Amino acid sequence: MTLRSHVVAFAPPQQAAVRRINAALARAPRLRTEGWRIDAGQRLSLWLDAAAGRVTTPRLKKRGVTVEIVQTDGEHPVNLRILHPAGAPRAVILDIHGGGWVLGSAGLNDRLNAHLAHHGFCVVSVDYRLLSERRRVYIDAAIADCLAAAFWTVTNVDRLGAATLFIAGESAGGHLAALTAVALRDKGLIDLVKGCVFTYGVFDLSGTESVRSAGPETLLFNGPTMQADLARLAPDRDEAGLRQPDVSPLYADLTGLPPALFLAGEYDPLFEDSLLMATRWGEASDADLIRVPEVPHGFLHFGGPAARGARKAIRTWLDARL
């Protein structure tokens, strides 16, 4: 049971590139989750998903990666987008996309997952239901969909051509991935899972201190409304209810879970989530925390040295567990 922490050191040219990205983000609109913004964003996301699929699928195919769409059984079938590598897969990765529980899709994660497929991993990405106050879809729906996807993946690992499974998620997907790992352990299905990767995950829906104190200068998010935005995920719960382990994995029993890798930017108001969760995980299992200085939430999407370094670190960590 160990926590190993590493701070990334950027050379001056890399640091300058990181700061240029931050300067651009400082001029960009902040993410907010009022109802009309969610509806508009989800309509745009559907269009982007279709457009991205027309671009990424042929690109993946040129590198020998094939795309398969399957659907789970049950009352609410869940679409799974599977990236099959060119050869026999080294392992399967269950990928849960980010997007604040309101945006994103499995298809839009092709760009983030391509490096894993090119590296020989079979990636199963989950199209879970997104939050919609208008349709009364909340966090419990997303959790249920991810569990259904996990059970399908565990059951079909042999069909996918591998004997080892990893679970990965970024941002909101990190939150859902952690809850999924706990659920698999509770069902006695965790032995197949050799590790979890959480990239700037959210682990406390009541809001850690760094979330509560986020100001208007926060990059990507609208800092002053972050705590309220989290509360919208489960409107039937008060603050104590948001701290319950069925929705906030920071407060869950973490014993019996596999090793985990945490990556987080130190300019992210959710950085404290990763720090606290990695500390707790390391008390129960093995955990590695990679701290990336001067980068905000979502840095995998922005390119540059932070994103390249994170992708390499993830591949290296996964390789060490095969």
What are the residue ranges of the model-derived segments?
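Proline/glycine-enriched tight loop/beta-turn segments at coil->beta junctions
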Residues: 75-78, 84-92, 121, 255-257
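Gly/Ala-rich beta-loop-alpha elbow adjacent to hydrolase catalytic centers
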Residues: 169, 173, 177
